[in-house]
Amino acid sequence: MATFARMKLCLSGSSQAIPSKGISLVAARFQSTASRASYVTPPYEKLMGKLQQVRKFLPGQKLTLAEKVLYSHLVNPEESFSGVSPSDIRGSLYLKLNPDRVAMQDASAQMALLQFMTCGLEKTMIPASIHCDHLIVGHRGANSDIPDSIANNKEIFDFLQSAAKKYGIQFWGPGSGIIHQIVLENYAAPGGMMLGTDSHTPNAGGLGMIAIGVGGADAVDAMTNTPWELKAPKIIGVNLTGAMSGWTTPKDLILHLAGKLTVRGGTGHIIEYFGPGVASLSCTGMATVCNMGAEVGATTSIFPYTDSMRRYLIATHRAEVADAASEVHSEYNYLAADTGAKYDQIIDINLSELTPSLNGPFTPDLSTPVSKFGEAIEKNKWPKKLSAGLIGSCTNSSYQDMTCVVDVVEQAISAGLKPKVPFLVTPGSEQIRATIERDGITERLEEAGATVLANACGPCIGMWKRTDDIASGEPNAILTSFNRNFRSRNDGNPSTMNFLTSPVIVAAKIFSSDLAFDPTHDTLQTPDGKAFKFRPPQGVELPSAGFIAGDSSYIPEPNPQPVPETEVTIDPKSDRLEALEPFEPYQGGEMENLKVAVKVKGKCTTDHISAAGKWLKYKGHLSNICNNTLIGAMNAATGEVNRAYDNGKGMTIPELMWKWKKDGQPWLVVAEHNYGEGSAREHAALQPRAMNGRIILTKSFARIHETNLKKQGVLPLTFVNEADYEKIDAEDKVSTRGIEQLLEGVLDQPITLVVTKKDGSVVEIPCKHTMSKDQIEFFKAGSALNLIREKAHSGVVNQKVIDSIKQQPDHYADAYIFNRHFVIAKGDQLGLPFHLKGVQVGDTIRLDKIASFGSRDFTLFGNPYVDPSLFTIEAVVLSFPKSALSVRVKHKRRHRHDRVMKHKQTYTILRVTELKLN
């Protein structure tokens, strides 16, 4: 378990010891395991201390598991909850959180790092990792696909690797595996919290972790130690009873739930599973369920701590994490909901009654039981012939998945059957690949005709070069164990219908050319004319001989230190990478005379807004990737895809946006429900912003995309009355009323759009927003990154500094003072938002918890802290002022108001009097 370092303080001229601000009981509990420290173990002592503070402000409140983990990661529980009613938290209160780590995949890491590099910091402030999985094409097999992809993406991989080295980020190279499988195997831990620049980051919920998909700007928040803001989600409780049997798998649980909730049903919620049925699920099975929670719009999903989680941790060489998790759960019931905890909605599912499902096409929530799939094919006139079967993706590429698949395949091969269609299999990681190869699974799959692809995303993210004769635009059906099936997503063909199902259903159906074949009941004819029926498959949860690492060169250093002198170059002539220019700050006042660039009809996912596939290569070049903006969107007026008009002249949507940017014409987009559904890709927000888009107006947003828009300085608005969607059209002129008040911090009034039609008539459309006070600051600054950069350059990120650090100080220190982060220089004054007990005005305090110490000429980095004998840093206590605490209250009319309570908050004001190298 991690050693819990404490700040050492001594009073000048006094022998009085100052206790750490924390919970001493918790500290005592965990000292016994400190010798087995692991940097991936959550800081349980700190988390329990935060949770105990939370319970003081929410006395008697029964907490769900999700709330426990979120609240234990609050920056300041007192600031968040003092004077707040429990009923005003979920769905209303913005939480400021400190995640434990960040993970980034290679497509999104490019933009995240380009943004981080502008902040001027020498290292990431929390552990971070980069995973090269999105840029590898699935074609002929791993042995040729990996070298080809490395050659084609050398510039990007070199950039990511050098940036990782410079800033102390772990780098998992191409072929190492899919980000979420590697996170599950190495970083996920019960009760921890992480952010990932991919929408399927919630996969780690299978290990009891709060793991949330975000855009790159949110990752920059975490990497710069800026508290990450999240509106407190509501909680959907899923009560599981019974146990699965036969052909039913964990994939069928989430496919069934997607059918019930729809793609919007989880928006603004965390899905928390509980009940006796949980114990019957494997850890990787629970990860599958959490992974696809993204498909219903959920913020994340989580399971309580179980024996299968402990077994998985031990099997993946993290016994110390398992021991620490078991201990904290035993002592504090941290990793399960409190008895009597309330949920905003409860869904009961009897696992014994579940049957296999197939979801699709073109949306992951159209769920059909396998027994009724044949009828659905006839009714909807879907293709009757299967064209390919694909197994893998971050959702279903575990060891257990592979053993289930090979059992099905061996049954068919033993009966003399052969696959009727191309059959592709993707292991989730190098560890999975090496282990299934050792155990003979790979050989048996290849003997059956399977093509084993690289340990990467491949076809799931559109990086699939098909080897069959399906022509572009030809209707065809594929079966996959993937998580998402939007039009054109997998192979670029808008007529390819992807039906999502479990790996075992895919494996069985490839032995029939009939898409309607039901392996749970139907039979196939063998070459000798006999009827063959599959028996229910049997898999193995964990390898009996243990996992093996495979190629150890993929494994990065456990805790890499930054190498500041590393050169990270961007060729100005490159068409793959482009340095970022800051967006202009908002100039104030109302927006006047915007024009509607396009009014979108129907589903508009991030795949429609910023397609992947062949466009992935431009993820690091904003100007180039802007050329795919909304190319999948349907024009509501004409029914055309990727078509817009300017005074009757037709052009592509990006062409119009570039034209209007050149003309100085700001614009907006109008769309329908769940705009931005799907991937976490922030390019879908960056691109409109870069081309002078200022407002996106919809019936509703997907959570991640709405946040990404706010981060980039684009104002997301929704209709107060959805019927008003019909009152606004492409090329209408739009001005705002109410933004001036918003900029002043007035949050509770709508913004009105004054729309001037082509015939000169005027209509007013009231709109809602969900901007917080911090998000308004992003908007005013031009983007969240502009604000972070400004704070970083002033010497501190998101902490109260009364006097900013001096320009170019002789020496500075990166200090942690009672878990609050400051970059300090001699003469600075600092405010700690609590009373520092045991000291008096005039006392001198020595600061020893220093992450780095440096000057204009050098920097010393600690591991995690610099040896205190190398420097002297002292601060004198100036005063203990009190400031009124402003809290949110509700009046009878249910309007929100800010009111100053009689309660006072005491601060400790320090001045840094000495800061020198010994």
Curated annotation (Swiss-Prot):
Its EC number is 4.2.1.-. One of its GO terms (molecular function) is structural constituent of ribosome. Pathway: Amino-acid biosynthesis; L-lysine biosynthesis via AAA pathway; L-alpha-aminoadipate from 2-oxoglutarate: step 2/5. Substrate binds at Q105, D198, S199, H200, R484, R489, K619, A680, R681. InterPro entries: Acnase/IPM_dHydase_lsu_aba_1/3, Acoase/IPM_deHydtase_lsu_aba, Aconitase/3IPM_dehydase_swvl, Aconitase/IPM_isomerase, Aconitase_4Fe-4S_BS, Aconitase_4Fe-4S_dom, Aconitase_dom2, Aconitase_mito-like. Residues 812-918 are annotated as: Large ribosomal subunit protein bL21m. It comes from the Eukaryota. SUPFAM superfamilies: Aconitase iron-sulfur domain, L21p-like, LeuD/IlvD-like. GO terms for cellular component: cytoplasm; cytosol; mitochondrial large ribosomal subunit; mitochondrion; nucleus. Residues 1-30 form a transit peptide. It catalyses: (2R)-homocitrate = cis-homoaconitate + H2O. The keyword Metal-binding applies. Residues 31-811 are annotated as: Homocitrate dehydratase, mitochondrial. Keywords: 4Fe-4S, Amino-acid biosynthesis, Iron, Iron-sulfur, Lyase, Lysine biosynthesis, Metal-binding, Mitochondrion, Nucleus, Transit peptide. GO terms for biological process: lysine biosynthetic process via aminoadipic acid; mitochondrial translation; tricarboxylic acid cycle. Signal peptide: none annotated. Binds 1 [4Fe-4S] cluster per subunit. In the N-terminal section; belongs to the aconitase/IPM isomerase family. In the C-terminal section; belongs to the bacterial ribosomal protein bL21 family. There seems to be no cleavage of the fusion protein, the ribosomal bL21m domain may not exist as a single domain form. NCBIfam families: aconitase_mito, PRK07229.1. This is Aconitase-ribosomal protein bL21m fusion protein. It comes from Schizosaccharomyces pombe (strain 972 / ATCC 24843).
